[in-house]
């Protein structure tokens, strides 16, 4: 009898475990044994790699080895002063890499070629392209933001996206992309991460981070997950001040650290440490995680077992810039590469002086320099690269690129609500009213596609409509059996008075061709029945796909990546 009770008890526990896991979120990981990332794992026994690294090390002075640990930012401009700055950091300070930011891709390529020509050791060219090249460079493909991509259920598409971004980076001579953002954005008031995150579910964020990063690295570009140990639940911008993460270790393990652990276990090669105060890990008040040995060496390297390249976040940011000898502190904390120092001459000299005083050993500098060189070899930098300038725009903006952008946009469309099964609409109903909340021509692709199924009658909602005009418009709409509200306007305050009294006795379908956070600006819920579709953008192909979804000739598989107030929870979606 006791055995029967025991079996019953075990059975109940087995049933409850998935429920408990779903409620509590990701379970903490146990420490994992360190292992080199996939990108360099085979190089430990590669004779040619070792010979190349040895040959470079032999000809570098101590100061030049220190220089290899710096990445300096350069504007992609062709003016004389900018070119002289480029020459100085490459020839005088022997930096290990460059970060270009903003401008035209043609200028970036010309400066990249010039810098590589001047460099004694090939430069690691880095880029901050969280949603592709368009984040920084004009005339490049504009992919959706991460929070939109977080709605996509097919992670193979995210991997494909990573491969494509890697291809474009290589076309520009870029070997490192400071992406993806691995922060779990569970604070809707976050002023800096927000749509840069894949969402608020640690599971979903982790899956997207791994898929995208693998795509990058399989395409020959180092991924750098950021901002360790997690910048998602803050209401302070680390560009302006030092955010505090006042959480327990158990909370950090289950939410903030979860995507980073998954990235490490997947064998991904780069991590960026953010400027964050984490009292439960580093008790020294005001010390940023990027300068904390307990965070970098203790948590990231020893506890989580990360053996890849550790980058600081930009050292010119306000979240860290008040500290003395920033670069020296960052190296002592365990970082490998120092990103965007304010005063490179003074910082290089400070590190050199510290080595001579014994605060850092030559052995530590040598180990970091060898590590950087090994990654350079893995990224094809054993020889100086040269980027072909002619045909650059055509190579970046290809038909395959445009097709991928289309598929990503369509896969993110999410039916948030379908109360009383309003959708799909029945074509036999006849005319439908279409209320256009935006510019007159903005929804023409939608209307054209809609006309394949029904006869749409368009009404345009003016801003700050007088009460009498609003009543007439509401009465006109009420004559139709179905109303489609198409929203392309981002600033919706001028329309709120109209919707406050919008309660028709017929079904209404709200179509938001704007970012999800704008949905709450319009009152919904008072119609006889409702459906809500979040399309994220007014892209022409997206508009056509939404029309197909409305009439059931296409389906939507998207799921909301981050809650929209209390109206729609993360994970919401109807197929």
Task: Map each language-model feature to its residues.
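Active-site-adjacent structural elements in enzyme catalytic domains
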Residues: 105-122, 155-171, 365, 370, ...
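Bacterial Sec-dependent N-terminal signal peptides
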Residues: 1-31, 37
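Active-site mouth loops of central-metabolism enzymes
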Residues: 71-80, 147-159, 241-255, 316-320
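Second-shell residues forming the walls of enzyme active-site clefts
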Residues: 61, 98, 108-123, 133-135, ...
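Preference for extracellular/luminal or secreted protein segments
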Residues: 22-72, 76-89, 302, 323-575
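Short glycine-enriched loops at secondary-structure junctions
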Residues: 75-78, 125-135, 175-185, 225-231, ...
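Short acidic, glycine-rich surface-loop motifs adjacent to enzyme active sites
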Residues: 87-103, 188-189, 264-287, 478-490
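Short, acidic/polar
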Residues: 78-91, 158-165, 253-260, 322-327
């Amino acid at each position: 009898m006791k055995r029967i009770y025991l079996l019953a008890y075990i059975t109940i526990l087995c049933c409850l475990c998935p429920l408990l896991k779903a409620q509590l979120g990701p379970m903490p990981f146990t420490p994992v044994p360190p292992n080199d990332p996939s990108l360099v794992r085979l190089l430990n026994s590669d004779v040619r790699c070792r010979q190349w690294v040895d040959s470079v090390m032999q000809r570098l002075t101590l100061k030049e080895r220190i220089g290899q640990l710096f990445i300096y930012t350069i504007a992609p401009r062709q003016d004389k002063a900018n070119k002289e700055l480029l020459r100085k950091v490459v020839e005088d300070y022997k930096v290990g890499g460059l970060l270009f930011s903003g401008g035209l891709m043609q200028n970036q390529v010309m400066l990249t070629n010039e810098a590589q020509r001047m460099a004694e050791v090939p430069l690691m060219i880095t880029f901050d392209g969280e949603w592709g090249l368009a984040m920084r460079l004009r005339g490049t493909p504009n992919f959706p933001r991460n929070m939109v991509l977080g709605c996509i259920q097919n992670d193979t598409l995210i991997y494909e996206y990573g491969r494509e971004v890697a291809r474009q980076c290589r076309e520009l001579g870029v070997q490192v992309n400071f992406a993806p953002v691995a922060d779990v954005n569970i604070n809707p008031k976050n002023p800096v991460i927000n749509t840069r995150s894949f969402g608020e579910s640690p599971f979903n964020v982790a899956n997207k981070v791994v898929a995208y990063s693998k795509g990058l690295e399989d395409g020959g570009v180092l991924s750098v997950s950021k901002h360790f140990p997690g910048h998602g639940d803050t209401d302070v911008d680390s560009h302006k001040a030092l955010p505090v993460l006042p959480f327990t270790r158990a909370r950090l393990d289950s939410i903030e650290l979860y995507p980073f652990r998954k990235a490490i276990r997947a064998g991904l090669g780069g991590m960026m440490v953010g400027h964050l105060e984490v009292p439960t890990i580093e008790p020294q008040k005001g010390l940023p995680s990027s300068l904390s040995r307990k965070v970098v060496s203790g948590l990231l390297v020893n506890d989580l077992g990360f053996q890849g390249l550790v980058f600081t976040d930009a050292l010119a940011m306000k979240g860290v810039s008040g500290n003395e000898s920033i670069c020296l502190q960052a190296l002592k904390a365990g970082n490998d590469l120092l990103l965007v120092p304010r005063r490179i001459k003074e910082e290089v000299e400070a590190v050199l002086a510290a080595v001579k005083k014994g605060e850092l050993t030559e052995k530590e500098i040598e180990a970091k320099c060898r590590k950087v060189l090994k990654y350079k070899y893995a990224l094809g930098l054993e020889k100086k690269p040269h980027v072909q300038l002619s045909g650059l725009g055509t190579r970046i903006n290809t038909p395959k690129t445009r097709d991928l952008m289309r598929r990503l946009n369509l896969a993110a469309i999410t039916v948030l609500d379908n109360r009383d099964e309003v959708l799909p609409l029945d074509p036999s109903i006849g005319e439908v009213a279409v209320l256009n909340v935006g510019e007159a021509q903005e929804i023409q692709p939608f209307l054209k596609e809609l006309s394949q199924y029904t006869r749409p009658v368009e009404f345009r909602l003016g801003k700050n409509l007088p009460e009498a005009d609003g009543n007439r418009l509401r009465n006109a709409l009420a004559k139709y059996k179905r109303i489609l509200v198409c929203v392309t306007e981002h600033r919706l305050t001028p329309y709120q008075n109209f919707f406050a009294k919008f309660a028709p006795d017929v079904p209404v379908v709200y179509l938001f061709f704007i970012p999800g956070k704008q949905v709450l600006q319009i009152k919904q819920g008072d119609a006889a029945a409702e459906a809500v579709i979040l399309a994220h953008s007014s892209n022409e192909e997206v508009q056509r796909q939404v029309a197909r979804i409305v009439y059931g000739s296409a389906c939507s598989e998207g799921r909301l990546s981050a809650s929209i107030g209390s109206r729609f929870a993360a994970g919401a979606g109807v197929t």
